[in-house]
From Swiss-Prot:
It comes from Escherichia coli O157:H7. Keywords: Metal-binding, Molybdenum, Oxidoreductase, Periplasm, Signal. It is an enzyme of class 1 (oxidoreductase). Reduces trimethylamine-N-oxide (TMAO) into trimethylamine; an anaerobic reaction coupled to energy-yielding reactions. Can also reduce other N- and S-oxide compounds such as 4-methylmorpholine-N-oxide and biotin sulfoxide (BSO), but with a lower catalytic efficiency. Gene3D superfamilies: 2.40.40.20, 3.40.50.740, Dimethylsulfoxide Reductase, domain 2, Dimethylsulfoxide Reductase, domain 3. Its main location: periplasm. This is Trimethylamine-N-oxide reductase 2. Binds 1 molybdenum-bis(molybdopterin guanine dinucleotide) (Mo-bis-MGD) cofactor per subunit. InterPro entries: Asp_de-COase-like_dom_sf, BisC, CT_DMSOR/BSOR/TMAOR, Molybdopterin_N, MoPterin_dinucl-bd_dom, Mopterin_OxRdtase, Mopterin_OxRdtase_prok_CS, Prok_Mopterin_Oxidored. Its EC number is 1.7.2.3.
Length: 809
């Protein structure tokens, strides 16, 4: 039901489960290598892990780098934190009466049970719910970042089990790019956000101006969907050394802007006004005759309709630089200068994703493509636009060699009965609370009327929805509705503390796996070797679902595993990659030798791929290489969207003022920016020692402009209460001139820690609005919120976010 990021990006490899093989000669499950160093990997790259006496004592990056990655130091914290779930647990009220628990989720104590008891209880209630309500009542979308690896993919393994059981309700899209990945196929014929970018060597050689629009790669390139190849940061370092001018458009002076120093010009518009700023630039280009009419005529459709809007012919409002300045807070002269600079130089517009995680977020990337089209540089070396330079090292040229396939939710030789009777469904990922609140409700999505399933059971594996979903208090209320909620987790997250049944799962350091580095480059294959024994009673997801499959039917375990254990699957994946490498005339060692060598494999560079230009073929021949849009061209005006008739997503890029922004704020309200943190992967590692690098008064920091802080009597280091109609949080003040006046920043990902309505840890999503971006994409809009702030003068409550819950003996 779910198309993953990796599947968007990867166009090679084979489906897992097509062939049954037996294990090769036995290999050690884990071992302390020479010097106690074991090679493994995580989202934050290949790592050498040091083990002493069965415990991880340190971890360091395994790849050479110029810019250090703090996340690579966290292996010991991940395995040995006191936040680990140690045993299978069941909520007491649920254990007493699964059909009618006396207490609500989040209000109960837990009882330790055996694995056998836990799995039996899950199986019995799962079967009951499925038989009574059908497969659509089982939600197994289970969105989240999980751990790296091609085998131990929590979400996929869950869905593999649910397919064997008869189907489930899943999700579509993701929280990262939910708006863009739905609008972009209408504009350029692909999701775009997960496509390879024009190569970095061509950027460095040909780009004269680089615009970083709402992106902070110094933070976001510490990670990747598989494992970072670490080259993106190296290329940004080379860009800095080149001295090329960088324009950074962002309400906050990010780590990236600080990194570029004097090379960077920082422009700080009012939050949520990016479309208006782009329109002002576009209007200036048009009035000065600097828009590329030839490109617009040959490669796009619908520009004349858009120009009527731009000039004000259609609505009596010219989108001039003066009009833009009033909305954005960016001076008119600077807007004009921006337009002239972009037109006079080979300009690469690099955009992040935060700007589309807003109400009407679909308009942001659409308008940026339109601006790039007006400049006429799309498909040229170093020109045009790119939406993935900040993610997974987009632009690092794709290597030639083997590509690892991955575990599939489909089982060889098995077809889900639900697929035949219409029982499989998917809801937009950020509309889970809407679905729980409105079972059977109708909603519009991408031109079609859809129906929410009546969800009775939820299983979440490898994700933390209580941190990544908006409006936490609304989520908690909706979370009471299902009859059973199971969470498979390594840690006592807020989601785990609101589950009926909690299963302790291994970290990636307690099992064996494989991964690629570089979602675009496929640069390395890395052995993810088990470093330590499973902690406490933790088990692998693969083994948990295999056991549950046996409870479904005799022989279910054999069907689920396809007769392969952990090492046999890894050999199967590796052998497939080796076969692909051989076809490319790249030599890889045999699997046993590779595994025992404790070394990664680097694939061969490709001179052809180093010259890759996004949309280069389209520019060379737009007929032969037509885009996947109805016209085959870039669609500035979409007749498809015109037919949809959505007022919140018109047929061309449009400035639509959000419900909560500077223009609707009272004199005491500030706009809330929820940026990506420097020392976490979203909510992952919130418990780690890295917390000492950023926490203020042991809380999530809030960045406040100097003048705003003075106005509210707040000093650096003070505790600050932040609130609105949705909730309240406690934060620690960081006072600076490095943020737009009228904007505060609380980085996303802090674990919710609620007591008497106050989140003691400072989770931003307690404050954000759970509204759809529009009827088109129904994506999250976490960057559209207004808040109040005040100095907190009460006694600071004890932080309990990382504590074990109360357990009844």
């Amino acid at each position: 039901m779910t198309l993953t990021r990796r599947e968007f990006i990867k166009h090679s490899g084979i489906a897992a489960g097509a062939l049954v093989v037996t294990s090769a000669a036995p290999l050690p499950a884990w071992a302390e290598e020479k010097g106690g160093k074991i090679l493994t990997a995580g989202r934050w790259g290949a790592m050498n892990v040091e083990v002493k006496d069965g415990k991880i004592v340190s971890s360091t990056g395994a790849l050479a780098k110029t810019i250090p990655n703090s996340l690579q130091s966290t292996a010991a914290d991940q395995v040995h934190t006191t936040a680990r779930i140690q045993h299978p647990m069941v909520r007491k009220s649920y254990l007493d009466n699964p059909l009618q628990p006396a207490k609500g989720r989040g209000e109960d104590t837990y009882v330790q049970v055996s694995w056998e008891q836990a799995l039996k209880l899950i199986h019995e209630q799962h079967e009951r719910i499925r038989k009574a309500n059908g497969p659509s009542a089982i939600f197994a979308g289970s969105y989240g970042w999980r751990s790296s690896g091609v085998l131990h993919k929590a979400q996929t393994l869950l869905q593999r089990y649910m397919n064997l059981a008869g189907g489930y309700s899943g999700h579509s899209g993701d929280y990262s790019t939910g708006a863009a990945q739905v609008i972009m196929p209408h504009v350029v014929g692909s999701v775009e956000v997960y496509e390879q970018q024009t190569s970095w060597p061509l950027i460095l050689e040909n780009s004269q101006v680089v615009v970083l629009w709402g992106m902070n790669p110094l933070n976001t390139l510490k990670i990747a969907w598989s494992s970072t190849d670490e080259q993106g940061l190296e290329y940004f370092h080379q860009l800095k050394k080149s001295g090329k001018p960088v324009i950074a458009i962002d309400p906050i002076r990010s780590e990236t802007i600080e990194f570029f120093g004097y090379n960077a010009t920082w422009i700080a518009p009012n939050m949520g006004t990016d479309v208006a700023l782009m329109l002002g630039i576009a209007h200036t280009l048009m009035t000065q005759g600097k828009h590329d009419k030839v490109f617009l005529e040959k490669y796009t459709t619908g520009y004349p309709q858009f120009e009527e809007y731009l000039t004000g012919k259609s609505d009596n409002t010219p989108k001039s630089a003066a009009w833009t300045a009033e909305i954005t807070g960016v001076p008119e002269a600077q807007i004009v200068k921006l337009a002239e600079l972009m037109a006079a130089n080979r300009t690469m517009l690099m955009a992040g994703w935060g700007i589309q995680r807003q109400q009407y977020g679909e308009q942001k990337h659409w308008m940026l493509v339109t601006l790039a089209a007006m400049l006429g540089q799309i498909g040229t070396p170093g020109g045009g636009f790119g939406f993935s330079y900040h993610y997974s090292n987009g632009g690092n040229p794709t290597r030639v060699g083997g590509v690892l396939p991955e575990m599939s939710a489909a089982i060889a030789g098995q077809a889900s009965e639900a697929a035949d009777d219409g029982g499989m469904t998917a809801i937009p990922v950020a509309r889970i609370v809407d679905a729980l609140e409105n079972p059977g409700g109708k909603y519009q999505h991408n031109g079609k009327e859809q129906t929410y399933p009546n969800i009775k059971m939820i299983w979440w594996a490898g994700g933390g929805n209580f941190t990544h979903h908006q409006d936490t208090n609304r989520l908690i209320k909706a979370w009471q509705k299902p009859e059973m909620i199971v969470v498979s987790e390594c840690y006592w997250t807020a989601a785990a503390k609101h589950a009926d049944i909690v299963l302790p799962i291994t970290t990636s350091f307690e099992r064996n796996d494989l991964t690629m580095t570089g979602d675009y480059s496929n640069q390395h294959i890395v052995p993810m070797k088990q470093a330590v024994a499973p902690q406490f009673e933790a088990r692998n997801d693969f083994d948990v679902f295999a056991e549950l499959a046996e409870l479904l039917k005799p022989g279910g375990k054999e069907i689920y595993t396809e007769g392969k254990d952990e090492m046999a699957w890894l050999k199967f994946f590796y052998d497939a990659a080796q076969k692909g490498a051989r076809a490319q005339r790249v030599t890889m060692p045999m699997f046993n030798a590779f595994w025992q060598q404790n070394k990664l494999i680097e694939m061969r560079r490709s001179e052809k791929n180093e010259q890759y230009v996004r949309y280069g073929d389209f520019r060379a021949d737009p007929v032969k290489n037509a885009l996947g849009t109805p016209s085959g061209k870039i669609e500035i005006y979409s007749k498809t969207l015109e037919k949809f008739g959505y007022k919140d997503c018109p047929a061309h890029p449009t400035w639509l003022a959000p419900d909560e922004w500077k223009g609707t704020a009272d004199e005491k309200q500030l706009q809330l920016l929820t940026a990506h943190p420097a020392h976490r992967l979203h909510s992952q590692l919130n418990y780690a020692q890295l917390r000492k690098k950023y926490a203020v008064a042991d809380r999530e920091p809030i960045t406040i402009h100097t003048e705003d802080a003075a106005r509210f009597g707040i000093a650096n280091g003070d505790l600050v209460r932040v609130w609105n109609k949705r909730g309240q949080i406690l934060t620690g003040a960081v006072v600076t001139d490095g943020i737009k006046k009228g904007v505060v920043c609380v980085h996303e990902g802090a674990w919710p820690d609620l007591e008497n309505g106050l989140c003691k840890n400072g989770s931003a999503n307690v404050l954000t609005a759970d509204i759809p971006s529009s009827q088109l994409a129904n994506a999250c809009a976490g960057n559209s919120a207004l808040v109040y702030i005040e100095k907190y003068t009460g006694n600071a409550p004890k932080l309990t976010a990382f504590d074990q819950p109360a357990v009844q003996a």
